[in-house]
C-alpha cells in the first residue's frame, strides 16, 4: 500500500484536541504525517501532553502590524519546510498560512471552518481551499461572500467540538488531582474571551468576566482558565478564585463543574456537549455553531452582566432546575 504524505498545520490550542484523534487514526493507517504548529498560547504544551511530534514554526502577533508581519514570516518559513516534502494533501482548521502555501505549491488542501465571522481569515483562505468542511448550520452564502467555491463546501450535522471527545475518559477525581481548595459546594468554571484573536476587538488586559467574578465568588468556587499570562493577571489575588495553569484536563473539569461561564466559544460548546449547564457571554456576534446549541436548549447566551449573574445565582440555589433559556 502506498502511503500519503499529509501536512497538518495547527495554529490554535483547541485545534490540538480536534486533530489529536485524526492524527492517531492516520498514523494507524500508515500515512506519513508532517505536523507544524505555531508558538501561541498552550499549543506546544498540549502537543506534548498528547505526545504529538511537531515542528514549531512561527508565532502569534498582537497588533494588526504584528499579525501581518508574523503571518508573512511564518509563510516564508513554512515554504522552506514543506517545499521538499512532496506533500499529497494539506489539512488545517482556520490556519491562515496553510491554504496560501498549499495553493502556491499546488498541494490540494482540506480546510475545517466553524467561524463565519472571521472576516480577515476567511477572505485570505477560503478562495484558495479545494475542500471546506463546515457545520450545516453555517450559511453557505456567507462563505461564498468570502470567495468560497460552493462546490467545494462539505456540510455536516454538528460542530467540530464533537471530535474532542472521541477518546475522552472522564476523570471524576480531577478536582483532587489538581489539589483544589474549594470553599463552597458549587464550582463555576470560567474561560475569558479570545482577546488576541483577529476577529474580536478586545483589550487583552481586561475581561468581560471581571464583574461576574466579583459577585459570584461570594457564592461559589471560581476556576479561571486563562488563555495567556496577561489574562491570568487580571484575576490574580482575588479571594476564592483559582487560576488554572494549562495544560489541564479541561474536559473532565467541565464535566465536574456545576456551571460553565465562557466568554469564548470552544469551551462553551464542549460544555454543551457534556450537558454541563453553560452561559455564553462571548462579546462578539453569535456564531451559527453557538446558535446550534442555544436552539437545543443546551446553552444560554447573554451580554447583560446583571442577567448572567441572576441566571448563575438562580442555578446555584436551584441546581436541579434547568437554566431558563
Show where each model-derived region lies:
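Short acidic-hydrophobic, aromatic-tinged amphipathic segments that line or gate anion-handling sites
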Residues: 55-56, 154, 242-246, 299-308
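Catalytic donor nucleotide-activated moiety binding site of glycosyltransferases and closely related
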Residues: 50-62, 190-192, 213-244
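Short internal beta-strands
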Residues: 33-39, 223-227
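A nucleotide-sugar donor-handling region in carbohydrate enzymes
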Residues: 133-204
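Catalytic binding pocket for nucleotide-activated donors in carbohydrate/polymer assembly enzymes
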Residues: 273-320
Amino acid at each position: 500500500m502506498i502511503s500519503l504524505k499529509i501536512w497538518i498545520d495547527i495554529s490554535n490550542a483547541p485545534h490540538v484536541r480536534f486533530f489529536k484523534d485524526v492524527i492517531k487514526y492516520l498514523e494507524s493507517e500508515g500515512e506519513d504525517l508532517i505536523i507544524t504548529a505555531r508558538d501561541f498560547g498552550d499549543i506546544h504544551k498540549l502537543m506534548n501532553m498528547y505526545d504529538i511530534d511537531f515542528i514549531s514554526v512561527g508565532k502569534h502577533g498582537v497588533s494588526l502590524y504584528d499579525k501581518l508581519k508574523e503571518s508573512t514570516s511564518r509563510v516564508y518559513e513554512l515554504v522552506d519546510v514543506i517545499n521538499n516534502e512532496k506533500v499529497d494533501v494539506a489539512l488545517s482548521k482556520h490556519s491562515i498560512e496553510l491554504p496560501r502555501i498549499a495553493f502556491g505549491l499546488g498541494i490540494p488542501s482540506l480546510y475545517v471552518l466553524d467561524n463565519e465571522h472571521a472576516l480577515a481569515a476567511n477572505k485570505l483562505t477560503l478562495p484558495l481551499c479545494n475542500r471546506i468542511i463546515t457545520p450545516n448550520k453555517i450559511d453557505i452564502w456567507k462563505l461564498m461572500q468570502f470567495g468560497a467555491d460552493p462546490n467545494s463546501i462539505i456540510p455536516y450535522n454538528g460542530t467540530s467540538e464533537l471530535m474532542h471527545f472521541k477518546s475522552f475518559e472522564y476523570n471524576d477525581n480531577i478536582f483532587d488531582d489538581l489539589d483544589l481548595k474549594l470553599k463552597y459546594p458549587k464550582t463555576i468554571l470560567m474561560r475569558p474571551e479570545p482577546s488576541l484573536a483577529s476577529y474580536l476587538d478586545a483589550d487583552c488586559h481586561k475581561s468581560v468576566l471581571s464583574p461576574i467574578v466579583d459577585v459570584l465568588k461570594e457564592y461559589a468556587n471560581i476556576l479561571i482558565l486563562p488563555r495567556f499570562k496577561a489574562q491570568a493577571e487580571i484575576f490574580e489575588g482575588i479571594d476564592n478564585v483559582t487560576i488554572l495553569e494549562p495544560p489541564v484536563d479541561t474536559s473532565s473539569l467541565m464535566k465536574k463543574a456545576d456551571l460553565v461561564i465562557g466568554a469564548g466559544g470552544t469551551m462553551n460548546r464542549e460544555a454543551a456537549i457534556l450537558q454541563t449547564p453553560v452561559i455564553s457571554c462571548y462579546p462578539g456576534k453569535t456564531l451559527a455553531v453557538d446558535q446550534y446549541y442555544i436552539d437545543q436548549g443546551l446553552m444560554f447566551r447573554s451580554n447583560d452582566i446583571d442577567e448572567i449573574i441572576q441566571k448563575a445565582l438562580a442555578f446555584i440555589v436551584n441546581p436541579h432546575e434547568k437554566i431558563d433559556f
